[in-house]
Each structure stands twice: as structure tokens, then as C-alpha cells.
Amino acid sequence: MKKIFSLVLCVLMVFALMAGCSPNVDSGDGQTSVQTVEFPVTVTDQIGNEITVDELPERIVSGYYISSSACIALGLEDKLVAVEEGTDQRPIYQLAAPELLETAGNVGSAKSFDLEACIAAEPDLVILPKKAQDYAQTLKEMAIPAIVVSPESHEELVQMIELIGTLTDTVDRADTLVAKYEELLGKVENITADISDEEKPYVYMCGTNSYMTTVPKDMYQSSLIAAAGGKNAAENIDGDSWTDVSYEQFLSMNPDVIIIPSNNMANGQPDYSADDISADPQLSEIKAVKDEKIYNMPYGFEAWDSPVPSGVLGTLWITAVLYPDEYSMEDFAKDAADFYQEFYDFEMDTSAIV
């Protein structure tokens, strides 16, 4: 039933987005005008709420680092009047939109959204994470349009980008971003196309707080592993959030590769190291430990295992880890640098990667 609802919701979102956008028009000289949005526009957000925005938003509040990163990629940083807490600890702000560190207000976190600060920012569009969805109705009653985003898969990340693009009249930029996203995923598909299911390695992705926490089958990070040509070692565990495992479960999974993600903050470091995993006597018989295939995801930019627009780089990096002969870290570093230059307008230091 959940899958059927998701499919219907996706179809409704597509039609809603199409209805709000005027088509590209041939000007008669062979040039095609930039696609624009006609306001008022009505859309369906990612939990099924219908929202109407009467005029082009000029003051945006984003209560979620994922939607904030998407807004920066869409060139909307000048319209962000308030964002989630902790911006001074997220490298992407310093690299791509340092002015937000001085100008943007603080509306708290997904778990503790500050409604009063949000209202004080006088927004004409609010973007909320699913954990703060209850505030959407309150804002609607105050005539402040609010959408809820929940990008827990590649497809839902694309939907979020297109949704924000429609509501902010940045459809052309959103289309360019999605096209790049699909181009990079297509590159990975070509690299892994001839690899049989039996040849694909089992990958265990740790949590940042503990290596005894991992990614169940319905979590976004599981889709990164699959897209990169791997198999989630925890594919038999149900759920869509970080899940604790026992040593017995870890040993039973016996992954070929262990990945330690970055924590999305300035120091980028989780609460443990690869050496801690290698030194744990209860994990000594795991294949990844014996083969010394424990890898730290690069840090200092964004957490590439999260559903931000640059999350596609997480898939590329895992591909380089799993299939270095087909796609090297040097290849990845170039693709990552090109991505950040095009959509975040900064020159990436690739030394931490290669």
C-alpha cells in the first residue's frame, strides 16, 4: 500500500509541477525562451499537502540543511532569510554562501523547529523537513505557504529539487541540476553495467556515532550503495533510519567493504576511527577487516551520504572505492570539482580525496 501511495503521489506531483510551468516558447529566431512559472502556482509537496503560492517568493526560510543546500545550488542564497541551526559548522556555507553566516536567521533544527523565529523572518515561502511537518498547517493558517520535503531516495531528491525550482521560478536551473545528476548516475551505470549480482561486493555503512549502527534497506544511503554497484550488507534489515546491530548480526553480514561516513560538520569526523574497527577483537574475522577494506568518506564539503544535491557524489565515491580500475579516485575528484564549480561556484580542494 505504501508503494502504491508513493507512486500516486509522484504522479500527482509531476502533473502539479507541469501545470504551474509555462512551456518553452520559440521566439521565431530559432531561440527558445527561458522557462518561467506563472503565479499563482499550486503544487503537492512530498507528504501529499497541496500548497498555493500567490507570488514569486522573495523571502525564503529553510529549516533543513538538505533544502538549504538545494536552494544554494539553485542560486537562491540571496533569498534565504533564515535557515537551520549550525550553519557555522557546515563547510558548504563557508565555501558557497559565506554571506548567509552573517545575514540568515536561525530557525532551530528539524527536531526543534523555532516557529517564532520563522514568523519573525517574514517569509513568503517556508521549506520544512518531515520531522517538522506539523508546523506546515500552522503556517498555512497564518497565510504563509509551507512545503514539506522528504528526500529519502534518488527519485525523491530529484522531486524536491524540481518542487523548489517550480515555487521559486528557477525551473531552468533545477532542470540543469537534475540533468547533471542523471548524467553522473548514467556514468556509474555504464561502469557497473557488466558486473553480475554475484560479483557485487557487500558494503556495510556505519553510522557516525557508532560502527555498531548501520543503514537498513529502506534508508537513502542504501540506494547510494546499490547505485554504485554494491549490495547493502544490511539489506535484510527493515527500516528507514539508522539501526543498531549486534556483533552476531555484524559477523553474519560479513561485509566485503566497510564505509565510515563523514558527520557533515566542520571536523567531519565520526566518534570513532577505522583503527577502532580493525582493533575490535569481536570483528577480526570479518572479511573487510581481514582485507583492510575500511574506508573513510571524504569530509570538508558536505556529507555525501545524505540526500543533498551533491549526494550523487556519494555514489560516485563509493563506485571509485569498489571499482578503482574502472573509475579512479582521480576521475572522481575531477567530477566532484566540476560539480561544485558549476552549481556552488567554488573551486574544490581535491587534495583530501586523492
Q: Where does each model-flagged region fall?
A:
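Bacterial lipoprotein signal-peptidase II cleavage site
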Residues: 18-32
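Proline-aspartate-enriched helix->loop->beta-strand connector
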Residues: 107-110, 114-128, 144, 246-263
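Structural recognition of the beta-strand scaffold that forms the well-ordered cores
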Residues: 61-63, 79-84, 125-129, 146-150, ...
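Bacterial N-terminal signal peptides
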Residues: 8-16
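Positively charged n-region of N-terminal signal peptides that target proteins for export
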Residues: 1-8
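Alpha-helical, coiled-coil/dimerization segments enriched in small aliphatic residues
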Residues: 214-242
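Extracytoplasmic substrate-binding proteins
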Residues: 43, 49-52, 135-213, 234-236, ...
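A short, structured surface patch at a secondary-structure boundary
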Residues: 62-121, 125-131
